[in-house]
Amino acid sequence: MNEKILKTLEYDKIQQALLGQVVTANGRQLVQAMQPLTDPVAVQQALDETADGASALRLKGGIPVPQLENIDPALKRVDIGAVLNGQELASISRVLQTVSAIDKFLTDLQDQIDFRQLYTLQESLTVLPQLSRRLKTAVDPDGTLTDEASPQLHGVREQIKSIEGEIRGKMTNYTRGAQSKYLSDPIVTIRDDRYVIPVKAEYRAKFGGVVHDQSATGQTLFIEPQAIVALNNRLREAQLAEVAEINRILAELSNELAPYTGQIKANAAVLGHFDFINAKARLAKAEKATEPLVSADNDVLLRDARHPLIDPHKVVGNDIPLGDKYQAMVITGPNTGGKTITLKTLGLLQLMGQSGLFIPADDESRIGIFDEVFADIGDEQSIEQNLSTFSAHMDNIVHILKQLSQNSLVLFDELGAGTDPQEGAALAIAILDAVGEVGAYVVATTHYPELKLYGYNTAKTINASMEFDSKTLQPTYRLLVGVPGRSNAFDISARLGLPGVIVERAKSMISSDSHELNNMISDLEKQRKAAETAYEAARRQLADAQSVHDELAAAYKKFTTERDAQLQQAKDKANTLVDKAQTKADKIIKQLRQMQLTNPGTVKENQLIAAKTALKQLHQDEPLQKNRILRREREKQALHVGDEVKVASYDQTGTLLEQFDKKHWQVQLGILKMKVPTDELKKIKSSKQSAAQRPVVKVSGGGMSGPSTTLDLRGERYDQAMADLDQYIDAALLAGYPSVTIIHGLGTGAIRNGVTQYLKRNRQVKTYGFAPQNAGGSGATIVNFK
């Protein structure tokens, strides 16, 4: 992008605002190097990064990037074998700690926020935990080495503290004891790195020792008393040892950094990028900016676009469309109406968007991707100072025409001004034609009436104007697309008190065509205002409807959530009760089994049926949908005399003998005939086949013959197989078998899986597993009981 346009549109002031948001040296470099991008993919990626930063700012207060100095010079010194000082090591330590903090920050958010680019940027970080801990332990943030930097440093510092304590104790005797009267002041100070006391010159001989300094008047001598000379010597030796150890540690730490300088430098650059993203997000928040859509076809639509350098309390937002149905817009109308500001707003927001910045415009605004943006705006002064002077720069226009392409955006302010009006209008039309022939996009402002007709008659060109309030005689600074500007001179003059005779005489002097054109423009303005009023009413109604819809959706979501929670709570409670009852049932079965083992022949079939319950059938399935399917399936089944059914309350299979009424049937269960409620009956299909395959436990008053140690479920339907398995396991338990074999075959695996799930839930099963290969392999399961 050419440098001239960046200056003309005050792009540098956006950079200055962004610089106020960065906190790292690398971040500042990225802001200073920021330029509008021309690759659509790169533009979208830059906008994605800003969107990620905005999400992090909104949800977590931003990416945790602290102030970081430029560590590149320090790393270069390490590369040549130099020893870094404490401040340089502290700066590098902060970089490494920040890398770890950001890596953890983003890792923790991976299940919460779907960032578009930050996770990819995170992959560029190299976390160096050991080196980071070493520096953090050894170096304080101010660059001072800590006592934990080495045992030797800790020891020598403890020695220094001890000696200093001895010195302070002896010095206290001088400042507070009998000899304090010989001192100028009862204080202890330091001269030449040694502890001294201020002695009156005439009492020099009272203390002996060494004189290190004297006052300006010579009346006070700073004396190191003889009694502490040895202590000061020991202190000095310890201090020198401390310095030597510090230098050794600094060299050691510098050597430890040497293998990682490239990774640390790359980390610092990535942290600068995170800082840059943070800054873009903060600037967007400050400007109430939004993410623009990117149009590869240069279909620009800025909604309620505001210039970012104008006071937000005074700026007027405008909708600025360009590129969809027309590539040229001619804005006509009087001066000081906001035409120049509109041009600059379009140009600057386009540059900001192509730089990956959010723009001060409403949601769903679109920017294009232009290779170049050119402008001929005569004043080139700060719009913050509200200065608008207009002059023609034909040399600049010639330069623009030589460089533009079909992917250029051109902004002309007061095109053709500064010369004879007739010639200026002709030049303006010719220049616009030249731009149109290339296929470039152009917005031009002018006050020449001839260009109004140009806007009507030229393909892909539309007129526009800046609104003027004829009642207040003030511009509103609102852009009216599709409506050319009209002169308000007659209305303004009349309202300011110009005699009506003069106004009417002036009107008679203009051509009828001009008069009709002004009337037509006036009618267009009225129609536009009516359309705007209708649009606003419709928009408000739509917003109200959307609000009601959102409230209803939220209420419905809350209802369904609470309903499901209550149903789940009820199911959990029911399952708890069923589990307790199941435990009791297991105890009963165990007792029956014990009775059969200790006293055969005492267990009757009616006792077995009464002990065996259908509590497992009452256990609620987790998915609610499954229960509904089962209920619907039950409703479809019609019962008839002779049908083989399963009695849910006893978990037994029987035959229907007679229907008493709609709610009860007589069922043959073994040797018993029982009256059973209809809703406890389930019809079993292919009953003859099932009856032939079902294992039978023969029970009589005098004894009970045990079932086989093998159950073959092959060929059965799933429901019948599960019922047979349940009955067989109970019979095997009552028979006292230590283990049995269930043959289920391979097939689709449905029955095998059902067997596995059943055995997993049964409390009487100790272990289970597939049979050996020579005994059926995965087609059979061996069950061991407790």
From Swiss-Prot:
Keyword terms? ATP-binding, DNA-binding, Endonuclease, Hydrolase, Nuclease, Nucleotide-binding, RNA-binding, rRNA-binding
Indicate the transmembrane segments per the record. none
Q: Spell out the PROSITE patterns in the cross-references.
A: DNA_MISMATCH_REPAIR_2, SMR
Enzyme Commission designation = 3.1.-.-, 3.6.4.-
Cite a single GO MF annotation. mismatched DNA binding
Residue stretches making up the Smr domain = 711-786
Output the GO biological process annotations, alphabetical, semicolon-separated.
mismatch repair; negative regulation of DNA recombination; rescue of stalled ribosome
A single Pfam family it belongs to is MSSS
**Binding sites annotated in the UniProt record for ATP:** G333, P334, N335, T336, G337, G338, K339, T340
What quaternary structure, including any partners, is listed in this protein's UniProt entry? Homodimer. Binds to stalled ribosomes, contacting rRNA.
According to its UniProt record, which protein family does this protein belong to?
Answer: Belongs to the DNA mismatch repair MutS family. MutS2 subfamily.
Function of the molecule = Endonuclease that is involved in the suppression of homologous recombination and thus may have a key role in the control of bacterial genetic diversity.
Q: NCBIfam families recorded for this chain?
A: mutS2 (TIGR01069)
What is the name attached to this protein's record? Endonuclease MutS2
Which organism does this sequence originate in? Answer: Lacticaseibacillus paracasei (strain ATCC 334 / BCRC 17002 / CCUG 31169 / CIP 107868 / KCTC 3260 / NRRL B-441) (Lactobacillus paracasei)
What gene is behind this protein? mutS2
